[in-house]
Amino acid sequence: AANGVKVNIWPVLMPVPTVSFATRYLHTSAGVMVTASHNPGKYNGYKVYGADGCQITTEAAAEILAEIEKLDIFADVKTSDFEAGVTSGNIQYIPDEVYTAFVNEVKNQSVLFGEEVNKDVAIVYSPLNGTGLKPVTRTLKEMGYTNITVVKEQEEPDGNFPTCPYPNPEIKEAMA
C-alpha cells in the first residue's frame, strides 16, 4: 500500500478459494495469499493469482521474480503503518457482500442444489486446523443440512497443525 498498490484484504482468515474468487469479483489485477495450503506448517507458501483468478503460470512467476530481483528492498520498497494504509484508502477491507457471493456461487455449483435429498444426513467435517470452518458450515446450513458435526480438535485455525502434521485430505493419515 505504501508503494501505491491498492490492497483489498479480508477482515478475517479465509480459505484460498475465496482469494481466487475475490480477485475476479473485485476485478483486481492480482490476488496474493500466504498459506500452508495442504502442506505441513513449515512449508507456508505464497500463492499468486492473475486477474482471471487462476494461479499464475511458471512463466509469469519467473517474470515477477525477475522484477523483484531488480529491487533494492531497503531503498526501493516503502513501508507504512497498516492503519495509515486503511486511513489513506490504499488498504480496504473486502466487504461481506463478496463473501456472500462466494458462498452463493459454491451452492450453485452443487450437483444436488435444489434437489430433494435427506437434509438430516450425518455430516462429519474437519477443517484440519485450516480456515474452512466458517464458509463450509455456512454453506451447508444455508443448503438446509442440519446434522453437522465438526471435529473439535481440528476446528480452529492453527498453522502448526498439532493433530495432523500433513493436513492434506487426499492423504489417508490426515483423516485418521
Q: Which residue ranges define each predicted feature?
A:
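N-terminal small/polar loop signature for handling phosphorylated ligands or for N-terminal nucleophile
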Residues: 1-43, 139-176
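Gly/Ser/Thr-enriched, mixed-charge loops and adjacent short helices
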Residues: 44-174
